[in-house]
Amino acid sequence: MSSVHAINQSYWFSPRLPHVESRSTRNSSHAYKTHSHAQFSIGAIEHGETLCHYRNETYHLQVGDLIFIDPQQPHSCNPLPGKTRSYHMLYLDTEWCLDQIAAHCGYQAETLRCSRIVLRDPALFIRYQHVVTLLYRGEITSADHHLKAMLEPIWRQYCLPAPSCLPALPHHASQNTTRHVRERLLNNLQESPSLETLAEELNLRRETIVRQFRHDTGITPMAFLNNARIEYAKSLLKQGTPLVDVSYQSGFCDQSHFHKTFVQYTAATPGQYARSIFDNK
């Protein structure tokens, strides 16, 4: 596995356009743990090939492909063995996306779920690349305009939700377990309950909790907690919080554990991420 210090990658974020974050990675063979993002994610493959595991399927992405990943959905996109790939990611604030969708469909959407996962549309791909270029140039107003124009056909064709007045699907007992575990883990990232404590609260075996949680989310409770901690750490780094404080506030026992986990989920060190973000402020 290649060192993260050798990966040619960059992040873009600016408080002048807070609903957008971009990541660009070039000629990388680095693999990722299964993870999720709070944002709606759109990826674009510029070079090489990628295998993306998402919603219990594996998608073979090639140059020119776009992939849509819904908020909070576990996934992993990794290169073919011994190969490299180059790609861009756009991470779009979910509430902002829902407002944009509502403007097109005429009613407020409550959840964001695209009916299409992989799309090959050469014209849309070029528009995507143009948005990324504008972001890194710092042309904020133009980037925002072109981003909204690029997204409009995506919203209309693939992401229009059903009206919220439709009856909700029934919940199973395992989903109640999963909901309880998620809420307890997210309630206090610094002092999250142990699996033993959760087992006592739910009157279930630890193995049962892990199995039900994995069935409903695609990942284990510990993987979910680590992912949540890293996402929170990224938000603190965007605000300029010192690394030592980010580690503690995100719930990591020490800097070493924080550093290792951050690399596993982002293929960047916390310092690399922070420096790349602040280059655009």
Where are the regions a protein language model picked out?
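N-terminal regulatory/effector-sensing and dimerization cores
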Residues: 3-109
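Conserved phosphate-binding and hydrolysis motifs of nucleotide-dependent enzymes
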Residues: 48, 56, 218, 251, ...
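Short hydrophobic/aromatic patch on the recognition helix
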Residues: 64, 209-213, 257-258, 262
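Amphipathic alpha-helical segments enriched in hydrophobic/aromatic residues interleaved with Lys/Arg
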Residues: 104-166, 183
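Short, Lys/Arg-enriched N-terminal segment that forms or immediately precedes the first helix
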Residues: 162-169, 212-217
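Terminal helix-turn-helix DNA-binding modules in bacterial transcription factors
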Residues: 183-187, 192-197, 204, 214-259, ...
